[in-house]
């Protein structure tokens, strides 16, 4: 049992697990921001463009049940905006990583310099022979 607790502690304290936990917390906070953006800015504008339609109040009553499809539409818009924001973030991040990984190319040596180096080396060899 003690070995299992030690293994769990080692697993939980690994950098990847902690990074994932931080990402989940930040993602949840980001989701709240996007939901607020959709609920308070985007959907009211869409509602005005559609003739004063308030999506939060769209519903259908079936028997004693109320189906709030307006809230569902808002959830879809939330998802699309969050997915697009994550896509843009990942795209920017990968472009930075690609720039960082690209090796610096050496400038090619002009042929005249190569010839001069060969002549120098030949002259050194001739002087050694003398």
From Swiss-Prot:
Keyword field: Cell membrane, Ion channel, Ion transport, Membrane, Transmembrane, Transmembrane helix, Transport
GO CC, alphabetical: plasma membrane
Main location: membrane
PROSITE patterns to which the protein is assigned, alphabetical: MSCL
Location of this chain's protein in the cell: Cell membrane
GO molecular function, one term: mechanosensitive monoatomic ion channel activity
Transmembrane region(s): 11-31, 70-90
Keyword field contains Ion transport: yes
SUPFAM superfamilies: Gated mechanosensitive channel (SSF81330)
Membrane protein topology class: Multi-pass membrane protein
Function: Channel that opens in response to stretch forces in the membrane lipid bilayer. May participate in the regulation of osmotic pressure changes within the cell.
Sequence similarity: Belongs to the MscL family.
HAMAP family: MscL
Subunit structure comment from the entry: Homopentamer.
Name under which the protein is recorded: Large-conductance mechanosensitive channel
